[in-house]
Design a protein with these regions (language model features):
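Conserved small/polar residues in nucleotide/adenosyl-binding loops
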Residues: 320-324
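Conserved lysine of the Walker
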Residues: 36
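Helix-to-loop junction immediately C-terminal to a conserved catalytic motif
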Residues: 44
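Nucleotide-state sensing region of NTPase/ATPase domains
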Residues: 47-132, 138-144, 148, 203-208, ...
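An accessory alpha-helical subdomain
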Residues: 124-213
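Conserved NTPase motor "head" modules and their coupling/switch loops across ABC/AAA+ ATPases, GTPases
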Residues: 1-31, 172-186, 190-303, 310-318
Length: 324
């Protein structure tokens, strides 16, 4: 998919922007605060129906304005034109349209415009909690597997309902817990299997990119841990129920999965230098791009935001050639 042109009104600090793009490589230069990252974020919004940095849509409206609009004009590999529209007014629901037809569910759009973004915020994949690493898996898999996305949505809805019951000040029938636990188990098993299969296929691609950028200086890896690996997820949830009641939330399930990021045999969070961490993250995202290119129906868009900081000159030179 090629982004031919974008039109932006009142998005973050961008008052009015109209830009046409080259079909291959586009570079943006400017001082800090001019809106380069916000321009990339607007492109991201058109793929994921949300900002990469601020999930509260109304806060992405430019100060002292009442709305924002983002329109993207694309061209598919067969030459078919595609127009994506997003509009948001304060105190109103967000609208998302493809070729002037509004989506009834935003999830129906996910994967239509596959996209990978490399940015300074990626450092949270290493430094942050396990939720950041689960989100990485979710973002990749959801862009090529609708069954995964639907199962993840069902699981999260059931999880929210179970957590509500766990917080109840009044006695709750065990059968009611079982309803949501069965839904969590059914959807969670799908999520687990697909995460496991993804990681198995993804690891050699990631290692290849890291090896290329680092010139074989280090070995890296990924390992995936889940409560669903060694036992029935339904039994895990039932056995954890009494403890969960005390805590007021669900302690076990695929929402607690962990993706371990390794430098050699040790967590890169503890062992990696700034340069190694940056190389690891860039290789991870370039592998994501390559994986989606192989797996999906169209070539993803690749957004690179300030990626050369903390890399030595030799790795920067190698990185220039990697996307090609």
């Amino acid at each position: 998919m090629i982004l031919k042109r974008i039109s932006i009104l009142n998005y973050k600090n961008l008052e009015q922007v109209e830009i046409g793009f080259s079909a291959k490589l586009n570079c943006f230069f400017g001082q800090n605060g001019m809106g380069k990252t916000n321009l990339l974020d607007a492109v991201y919004f058109l793929s994921f129906c949300k900002s990469s940095g601020n999930p509260i849509d109304s806060q992405n409206i430019r100060h002292e304005q009442d709305f924002f609009v983002i329109q993207g004009f694309y061209e598919a590999e067969d030459g078919t034109p595609e127009e994506i529209y997003c509009g948001m007014k304060r105190r109103s629901k967000k609208q998302f349209k493809r070729n002037k037809k509004e989506y009834s569910r935003f999830s129906d759009h996910i994967g239509f415009l596959p996209l990978v973004m490399v940015s300074p915020a990626d450092s949270e994949l290493i430094a942050g909690g396990s939720d950041e690493r689960r989100r990485f898996m979710d973002v990749v898999i959801s862009q090529y597997d609708k069954e995964y996305l639907e199962a993840l949505i069902r699981y999260n809805k059931a999880l929210a309902q179970r957590n509500t019951l766990l917080k109840s000040e009044f006695p709750v029938e065990e059968e009611l817990f079982l309803v949501w636990e069965e839904m969590m188990a059914q959807a969670g098993e799908i999520v687990f299997r697909k995460r496991e299969a993804f990681i198995e296929e993804f690891i050699p691609i990631f290692q290849s990119f890291y090896s290329f950028i680092s010139q074989d200086k280090e070995q890296v890896g990924l390992s995936y841990d889940s409560h669903a690996r060694d036992a029935s997820l339904l039994e895990v949830l039932k056995q954890s129920r009494e403890r969960d009641k005390i805590m007021g939330f669900s302690l076990r399930g695929i929402h607690k999965d962990e993706l371990n990021m390794l430098l050699g045999d040790f967590p890169i969070k503890k062992e990696g230098s700034q340069g190694q961490n940056k190389t690891y993250l860039v290789a991870l995202k370039l592998a994501q791009f390559d994986f989606l290119k192989r797996t999906g129906q169209t070539v993803p868009l690749l957004l690179l935001d300030d990626i050369f900081d903390k890399l030595d000159a030799s790795r920067v030179c190698l990185l220039y050639t990697s996307p090609s």
